[in-house]
Amino acid sequence: MNHYSFSSLIRAFIPLSLVIVSAAWQPAALADTRHIIVDSGDSTLSKEAARQSKEQWDSTRSLRNKVNNRVEKEFDKTEKAIDGREKCNASYNVNAYWENTTDRCLDRRTGRPVTP
């Protein structure tokens, strides 16, 4: 009876051992088929994308410079008007007055521009 159970146990372990061996063999077989592709990134599509990105950057840079120049010009104009008003109001010339619509210091009698 003991001998019969041992042989049936062996018969059960043989297929089980084959499954274990085949499972252990599988990673080695997969490792042989794997390969690594190293790409330098210089494909035609990536070059075209880089060119388009640079072109867009250059155009937005030009636009930003135009906007910044306009803002700077407006600031300088306002600053010049404020300085002119302060000089005109501090002037010793009694007939000088500041005209807000034209941002100029004018003579009360003649209406001509005065340098304070």
Swiss-Prot record:
Origin: domain of life: Bacteria
Provide the leader sequence positions. 1-31
> Keyword annotations for this protein?
Signal
Asked if Signal is a keyword of the record, the answer is yes
UniProt family annotation: Belongs to the UPF0482 family.
| One Pfam family this sequence matches | DUF1283
Keyword Magnesium belongs to the record: no
Query: Where would you find the membrane-spanning parts of this chain?
Result: none
The protein in question is named UPF0482 protein PC1_2049
